[in-house]
Amino acid sequence: MQRVVILDGPDNCGKTNIGKELSRQTGITYFKNQDEHKYFLKDPEYFVHAIRYVDTYFTSYLESSGASVILDRAWPSEWIYSKALGRKSDLGVLEELDRRHAALGTHIIIPYRTDYSRFKDDYDQVNDNIKKIHDLYMDFSVWTKCKVLKMNVDDEDLDREVKEIREFIDA
């Protein structure tokens, strides 16, 4: 059975640790784009190009192959960060990706915290907008047609988090 899981949430919520452990336990390939930080400030257009050309291409691959994957950030990040940081985006492509991923049965996991004050990101733009980013993730969870699990990670209990995700994606 195909499993497409997207871990997407505010910075410093443990997405990478959760994704790697979920991959270890399920055998589903984990993927994180290592280039996103290279372009975050230098070329904001990178992200709109990524959703237009890379994410649509990769979604076609998922549709035709039946492959399973755990993605550490994906197109939902563009929905949130373009709004939070005032970047140009392409809502039409985001709507298309959402529709196609809903048809795939994609599960989106949004880890979040009740307090972000102890955590600092590498980018001041993120630190200055963390409350807005959090709120936009909550808005996204209502907007998307995909299955969404909003998961509080204040306790940083990786075993509980992965167990909760596994129960959600297996339901």
Please provide the spans of the model-predicted regions.
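NTP-dependent small-molecule kinase module
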Residues: 125-171
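Short, solvent-exposed loop/turn segments at secondary-structure junctions
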Residues: 11-13, 75-77, 114-117, 155-157
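Conserved phosphate-donor/acceptor-positioning beta-strand/loop module used by diverse small-molecule
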Residues: 71-74, 90-121
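Conserved P-loop NTPase "ATPase switch" module shared by AAA+ and STAND
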Residues: 67-79
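Conserved substrate/cofactor phosphate-moiety recognition/catalytic segment
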Residues: 10-13, 20-65
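Pre-Walker A (Motif I) flank of P-loop NTPase domains
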Residues: 1-4
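Hydrophobic anchor at the beta1->P-loop junction of P-loop NTPases
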Residues: 7
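A mobile, often basic/glycine-rich helix-loop segment
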Residues: 79-95
